[in-house]
Amino acid sequence: MSVFDSVRMDGQVAVVTGSGQGIGRGIAWALADAGCDVVVNARRLSDLEETAAGVRERGHRALIVEGDIRDFSDEIARRAIAEFGRLDIWVNNVGGSVESTTYELANMSDEFFRGMLELNLTSAFQGARAAAANMPNGGAIINIASGAGMRGSPMTGAYAAAKAGMINLTQTLALELAERGIRVNTVSPGPVVTEAYLGVLGISDQLEKLRQTIPLGRLGTIDDIGAAVMFLSSPAAGWITGQNILVAGGRTERSYQYGGRKQQGE
């Protein structure tokens, strides 16, 4: 097999949670481009139908499983096996924060904090557990975290704490599942242009200020994240496990601070 052929995953079956739109949709389409049949999951059927249509346009089968991922992972895995007879890749993409809702940790309720952990961290744990139970011949689990989980994140501390937990969850799962041939990695996106992201920031000079903190000079796209997940899922990444890949155009805590100082001096 050539290096170029090693990114192909013809005949493999992937589950992508939170794939109704945005990053999850981009991941589903990237995996279909690489040869996978894809199980798509989200809460809104209309969104899932569009994602599934994109998978089919790429020449592969799609299965829609509508529902809230929390406490639903085992059912998604069951349906994937029933429909396709195998499960090779599981992408935990469900997550996020409440749009336009920010709190300092000192003023945050227990309910809000627990809700962020359930949505972002517990759902990933449940998904990984369901995947591992249905990968007898090995496979790949990819957790979608965030650059926010790699640094302090004022006003979105619960979200950041959950994503940091996801990165550690990945490292532990990688060690526990290695002997079974299951690789586990994390992709941590930086700022990516999606409907949800624009809903928080709006189309304004805020986006330009954010762009100035990114060394490569642009915001990310869903294709950027999809490509990273496709690689980590493929045989080309067969000796990579337990890693967190920051896909953020070079944006780190240091570059973010540098960008902020630059703006203040303009």
PLM regions and their residue ranges:
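Short C-terminal tail/terminal secondary-structure segment
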Residues: 2-6, 102, 151, 230, ...
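Conserved glycine-rich cofactor-binding loop
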Residues: 13, 20-22
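Substrate-binding pocket helix/loop in short-chain dehydrogenase/reductase
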Residues: 101-105, 109-114, 210
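Active-site helix of classical SDR
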Residues: 128, 162, 170
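Alpha-helical segment proximal to the catalytic Tyr-Lys
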Residues: 133, 175-179, 238
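Residue(s) in the substrate-gating loop at a strand-loop-helix junction
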Residues: 146
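C-terminal helical subdomain
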Residues: 186, 205-240, 247-249
